[in-house]
Amino acid sequence: MTFGVVVLGATGFTGRLACEYLANRGGSKVAWAMAGRDLGKLEALRKDLPEAAKEVTLLKVDVKNEEELKDVAKKTKVILNFAGTPYFDKALPVVEACVSSGCCYVDITGEVPFMKTSADRYDAKAREAKALILHSCGFDSIPCDMAAWMAATAMRERHGMACAAIRNAVMDAAGGASGGTIYSGLGMLTQDVENKAAMMDPYGMDPPDGQRGPDTADGGTTDLPRWDELQEKWLMISPLSNPSCRTVRRSNALLGYPYGQGLSYGEGIVVPGPVSGWLGTMALGFMVGSLYFPPTRWALKRWVLPEPGQGPSRKAMEEGRFTVRAVALGEKAKSDGQIPKVVAKVDSVNAGDPGYKATALMSVETALCCALERGRCAEGGVMTPAAGLGQVLVDRLNAAGMKLEVEP
């Protein structure tokens, strides 16, 4: 039997949500399966899913077993991989199996070293095999990546020019954190992994022949709280800006710099004013700093941080939300002397909290782009959501109930 989508790591916190969503929305249109190490856990999950999923195939797949990975990749259009925590020591064999079989791959990682290593090792091979490898396909980094892409695309269509700058801002967000995400980030901070230096380079995920721009920080010129002239709001650094900014800059490079060759890109979280911005920045810095030192790290793990597999309550996920707003500034003035601006928004509407329920939706719709609308996607390579999918992803997310639009 062949499958359109195989959900790998289906019994994890976000994997379960993805299976629920796939059963309710996409399962009737595509043959899909759930995969993982423990068939007993998979069977228990299947019993908890809606009636439409009662006949879904279960596959025993261990990410450490090369033959099992190759076997499932050979009979699948796209593997949707949630077997991370962290991805950098579990997902590369999955990417390799997909590339060797011409199978597409989707995940929700925000691990810059892993994404850089994946691109270095497999981009050329994936292009040759016509395998589309898509990382960071959840809240990290679809909203910012697609908002920037929509704004830059509209700038060219409306005003015939590239952008001098794009600023993304998380205008509103509410949700919780799962243990898997926290421990994945902890691994990036505390372990010596390949390409860790890419986290410190604003252009660390660009292709080898990429053209560096003016950015020196994830906020563009600074990571400190600041009044942003484009957003016309106070911004502080976003915890997700490290992978998200590098994803957007990689999108621009992969597409041939349609956003602008000298583009300045940055992002942040909207705050009421400078005081709240500094307090938020200091709190974030304290938390990150505490994770570096063994005694405080042990205390946080013991009494504060959730374990892998744990996450927000169902109520918190249902009530969660987010809005991301991109403002693009044209590279030159028009005949009237005015420099044009374009505003694009990504709104979760009723998709749920950003990190989990909405991430499940976005990652499944990304996988369905590859499974059901492959002809509208990029041919292959280690891509980004914007560079690999573009308008097809915008269309699917809008059809799924989110709202992605460019303001008139």
Residue ranges and their predicted role:
Residues 27-41:
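Conserved glycine-rich Rossmann-like NAD(P)H-binding loop of the short-chain dehydrogenase/reductase
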Residues 49-65:
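Rossmann-fold cofactor-recognition segment
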Residues 85, 97-115:
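ADP-ribose/adenylate-binding Rossmann-like module
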Residues 125, 129-173:
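Adenosine-phosphate binding glycine-rich loop
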